[in-house]
Structures are given as structure tokens and as C-alpha cells.
Amino acid sequence: GFAVNPSDPDEFNVYNDPSWRPLLQLAEERSDLIRMRSAVRSRSWDPYRTLSSEAESDELRDLVQFHRYVEDEWHCTRVTVRAGGRTLTSTTRRNAQVDTVWTTEHLLKSVEDLDAYLQLPAAFFAEQIDVTPLVEEDVRTGDRGIVMVDTEDPLCAAASLFDMGDFLTVAMTEPTRFHRLLEKL
């Protein structure tokens, strides 16, 4: 499936715990492998992925800020996006014991937030397609399995921007705005 790196010393990498090693080794050696890899960002809406690319620009850096911190047993990330005269914020957190990122505050909370988000420049949404990771993983996997192209669709990307109730409300009551969002993503 997804990329697992048990040698990564990050305290929030659940797979570096020694208890995982026998299971990971067994799965690697005794099962057909399905390696999920993408030729684009795994989450097209993620501003961190945009700014981490070689195509980053001062314009984009001025629009997006990240604050990473540890609170109790949680690794938290607060993202602030300045768009359309508004300040949009989201917060995620991840526990060191579970490989799940929980969104505790979604970026878009209203139709007005969506309107502001739609004013972001095209570079914010730009994708750099690179099939190299797929080819490299295919060579490593060999005849032990397959490489599955893992790319999200615009509908899932849009859903992740909102609380589910807000997402459904906007999708049903604001079809023109929602379609514009899907076109951007």
C-alpha cells in the first residue's frame, strides 16, 4: 500500500516501533505487494505540498503560513491561507500511536470562505506531473507485486476542505461555486 519507512526516527512515525518490524517483514516477504504511488501530490489541495515543490514562489509563500507544534501527545499543524481579503485557517493533529491525521478545523467554513479560496492564483493549484516515483517503485517491486497509481479526484479534494455537513450543503445549494472549485482542484 502506502509508503512505510520504519527507519524514519520521527517520534510520530508509528512504524519505527520495534513491534511493527515482524509484521512489516512478513508482509514484505510473504504477500503480493501493491505499492500505491502518485505522479502528482497525494492531496492536491494541500498548500504545504504546493510550497514544497520546486515551483514555489514568493507570491505563494506570502499567501500561506504553517505553524507546527506538539501539544500533549499530538503533532499539530495550523495552516493559514490569505485569500480574497480573508484569513482561512485549518488545524490537523496526529497522535504518535496512530497513523491517522485528524482535521480538527477545516479550511473552508462558509460560502464566503469558498469565494475567497477561489480567488487564489492558478499557481496555488498547479500540479507538476512526475512519473519517476512510479517507475522507480515498479523496478524495486519487480515481479513481487504491482504499482497502483494513487491520485485523488477533485470531489474528494473538495470534500477535505470542508466539514462534511458544510461540504454537502455547498455542493447541493451552490452548484456554480462548487463546479468552479472542482475545476480548480
Where are each of the predicted segments found?
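Catalytic cores of TIM-barrel enzymes
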Residues: G1-L185
